A protein has these predicted regions:
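ATP-dependent adenylate-handling active sites, centered on carboxylate activation for C-N bond formation
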Residues: 1-142
């Protein structure tokens, strides 16, 4: 049932045949990518690495894309302009919290590569399934 719900949402919200997916290789991005795949969409999956160093996310994203035959696009995020990038996020994009700046920073470099009209992202399962820092602290002794 949940599969059908997610597939229907992807079908309604991303009607084009070719879509971009922000791919981490984790449960969220794989779920939304699988839904698009079932709809026979062409997937262009974008992930990033920082300063030429692969992360677990970029490694798992590449493996998933190879396995399913999705297009894989690895974007290298430089760190040589990080101070200006952070000020851009704060001033231009009005990021207020440290986590907003940290999580948004790579997308200054990823988004210019995306040409598709529709971009699929994960569903924030961390918040729903209790794997956030707050949930881990709260349920530490249960």
């Amino acid at each position: 049932m949940i599969d059908k719900i997610i597939t229907n949402i992807v079908d309604q919200e991303a009607p084009d045949q070719t879509v971009a997916v922000l791919m981490s290789g984790g449960t969220d991005s794989l779920t939304v990518a699988a839904a698009a795949h079932r709809l026979n969409k062409k997937l262009n999956c974008y992930t990033f690495r920082v300063d030429g160093k692969d992360s677990d996310d970029s490694i798992y994203a590449e493996k998933a894309c190879k396995h399913f035959g999705w297009n894989f696009k690895l974007i290298d995020v430089p760190v040589n302009n990080i101070e200006n990038d952070f000020f851009t996020l704060i001033k231009k994009y009005e990021c207020k919290k440290k986590t907003h700046v940290e999580c948004t920073f790579p997308f200054l470099y990823v988004y210019p590569h995306i040409k598709e009209k529709y971009i699929l992202t994960g569903w924030a399962a961390d918040g729903y399934y209790g794997v956030s820092k707050r949930a881990n602290i709260h349920f530490k002794h249960t």
